[in-house]
């Protein structure tokens, strides 16, 4: 995707870009994204599909696509989500979605668990309900390190934030969010300072992936968003997740090093130019 955008920008100057060219750029990016989404659809992995959609959105935004295209698409998606929820909550809506449109039962159960977690607390929403109770029981300062009074299945995975909130309370959860914000801020600074377009788009995709993971995981365990099985970066148990996150951090550190090297070369070039000018001035040439 990054190579496709860089190739497009090299062939199209900023002043020559039109809505038609921006639309074809989106199609090029989508051509790389849709096959991955298709594979994830076969695996019924909706959470990871949302992650790739977040990466797709971030790359499209930074590529400079006109808001005349982005805004209508965003409004259409927002309207579609609102319409879906209206149908889902209406009388006979769930039957229509399941029997007519073929919506899987497990997806409907996840939405029900999100909308009414305590109505099914003894069956399919036991984990979500217990997680929200654990967060609430933490209070302001928490119950203390390694103190977990509530049983939450597999809490070391997607529900790890409930442990932090229960043990360290609101203050501990807020500190974790501030650390994530600081990390994202540093990554954005590195990305914006980079002169390499290819690296810029790759790092943007990684940042969007990380931000979505944080937003979705904490939003899901607190009941703001549906539970989709997205891990909390650098904290949740999972080998592949931590490896991919560390690869992304390594990329950002490499970009930071290259930025410093580039700045040092520019300083050396300016100093050399100043010395050459001073020598010419001493010889009376200028």
Q: Which role does the model predict for each range below?
A:
Residues 129-171, 198:
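Long extracytoplasmic/lumenal interhelical loops at the membrane interface
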Residues 217-286:
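A juxtamembrane structural motif centered on a specific transmembrane helix
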Residues 2, 146-151, 179, 221-229, ...:
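Re-entrant/interfacial helical elements at transmembrane boundaries that shape
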Residues 100-141, 158-159:
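Membrane-interface loop/short-helix elements at transmembrane-helix boundaries
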Residues 45-50, 141-144, 155-157, 174, ...:
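Transmembrane helix boundary and interhelical junction motifs in multipass membrane proteins
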Residues 23-28, 122-124, 151-157, 169, ...:
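Membrane-interfacial loop-to-helix junctions in multi-pass transporters
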């Amino acid at each position: 995707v990054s190579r496709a955008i860089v190739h497009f920008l090299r062939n199209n100057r900023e002043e020559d870009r039109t809505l038609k060219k921006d639309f074809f750029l989106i199609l090029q990016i989508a051509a790389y994204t849709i096959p991955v989404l298709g594979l994830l659809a076969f695996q019924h992995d909706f959470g990871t599909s949302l992650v790739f959609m977040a990466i797709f959105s971030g790359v499209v935004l930074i590529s400079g696509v006109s808001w005349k295209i982005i805004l209508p698409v965003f409004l259409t998606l927002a309207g579609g989500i609102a319409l879906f929820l209206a149908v889902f909550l209406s009388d006979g809506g769930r039957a229509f979605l399941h029997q007519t449109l073929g919506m899987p039962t497990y997806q409907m159960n996840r939405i029900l668990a999100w909308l009414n977690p305590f109505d099914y607390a003894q069956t399919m929403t036991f984990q979500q309900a217990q997680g929200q109770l654990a967060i609430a029981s933490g209070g302001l300062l928490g119950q203390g390190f390694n103190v977990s009074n509530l049983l939450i299945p597999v809490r070391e995975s997607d529900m790890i934030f409930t442990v932090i909130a229960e043990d360290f309370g609101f203050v501990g959860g807020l500190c974790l969010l501030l650390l994530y914000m600081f990390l994202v801020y540093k990554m954005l600074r590195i990305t914006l300072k980079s002169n390499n377009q290819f690296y810029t788009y790759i790092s943007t995709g990684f940042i969007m992936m990380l931000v979505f993971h944080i937003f979705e995981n904490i939003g899901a365990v607190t009941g703001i968003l549906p539970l989709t099985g997205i891990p909390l970066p650098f904290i949740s148990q999972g080998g592949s997740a931590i490896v991919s996150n560390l690869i992304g951090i390594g990329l950002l550190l490499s970009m930071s090093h290259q930025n410093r090297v580039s700045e040092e070369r520019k300083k050396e070039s300016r100093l050399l130019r100043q010395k050459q000018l001073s020598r010419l001035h001493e010889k009376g040439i200028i």
